[in-house]
Amino acid sequence: MLQTLYVIAHTFFKICKLELGPQDLPNSKAFLLLVAVVYMGISTIIPILFEIPILKALLQTFVEINITFFLTFSLLYLTGHYSRIMKTLTAIIGVDIFFHLIALPILLLELYFKSISVDIGLAQILALLLVGWNITVYAHILRHALSSEFFVGFVITFVYLLVTIVILQSFFPISPEALTP
């Protein structure tokens, strides 16, 4: 069991290092479902850290994962890469788990600094670097899924990001007070 978890985690880590792509994952509905369930659990924790009620956090995560499913399905179906949908979704959701796990200590560091009224910007810099890495990995995954150049994957990643932000903001608006330190 631990060996299997190690292999899975190592595979997603290699995707994050741009060494593997979605084509290196199994084409399995059960594996996609497992990855999606783990993602739902981990992604629900982060909003709770910021005192968002658990039901709202679950709903937000549910909406977010459905956006990912819809955008990925639409993109690959419309470009004639229907057979790559399951592997691509598994890759995107799996690397999101990885990035959420890395983000947790950064967010906890930020909360700690806020609790002692210190702002050195370290958590923000780390978070920005993490977002940049996440965008790069998404572009890498989409490039492989579409058999295209990295630039194409990069542009599509920004469209994904924009659409996701707009939809999430329409369902779960962030008040201006929440953005002020």
Where do the model's predicted regions map?
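Juxtamembrane/disordered regions of integral membrane proteins
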Residues: 46-51, 107-110, 176-181
